[in-house]
Amino acid sequence: MRYYEIVLIIHPDSDNQIDNLVNYYSEIIINSTGKIHRLENWGRRQLAYAIKNLNKAYYLLLNIEISKNILDILDNDFRFNEIILRYLIMRTKNIIVDPSAMVKKKDDNNQEGNNSTVCI
């Protein structure tokens, strides 16, 4: 089993489908004896450049441990899923479970009185 970090950029009009998407991919990973070490929903954010005439999208970050053949299945599924605008799969050398800089930044904002929430 290898460790991977996956970032998904999801269509902004599919906010009600994000939970279903996360559950679907979580089931695939867990049923294949894989593990999800970190799952972060960064929320709806401004894109650096327009993708399919969209300026905002939802971001999801996953750190998982799976085998190569299951990664190929996920890669194929990401490619043909219409609500996933872009995705990035990176192999990592070890498990990453610490909160990302995006979550830390939002936590700092929460402590300053901002009421934005993070779903992990």
Swiss-Prot record:
GO cellular component: cytosolic small ribosomal subunit
InterPro entries: Ribosomal_bS6 (IPR000529), Ribosomal_bS6_CS (IPR020815), Ribosomal_bS6_sf (IPR035980), Ribosomal_S6_plastid/chlpt (IPR020814), Transl_elong_EF1B/ribsomal_bS6 (IPR014717)
Disulfide bond found in the keyword field: no
GO biological process, one term: translation
CDD domains documented for this protein: bS6 (cd00473)
Keywords: Ribonucleoprotein, Ribosomal protein, RNA-binding, rRNA-binding
SUPFAM superfamilies: Ribosomal protein S6
Disulphide-bonded residues: none
GO molecular function annotations of the record: small ribosomal subunit rRNA binding; structural constituent of ribosome
Chain's role: Binds together with bS18 to 16S ribosomal RNA.
UniProt record similarity statement: Belongs to the bacterial ribosomal protein bS6 family.
Protein name per the record: Small ribosomal subunit protein bS6
Organism whose genome encodes this protein: Blochmanniella floridana
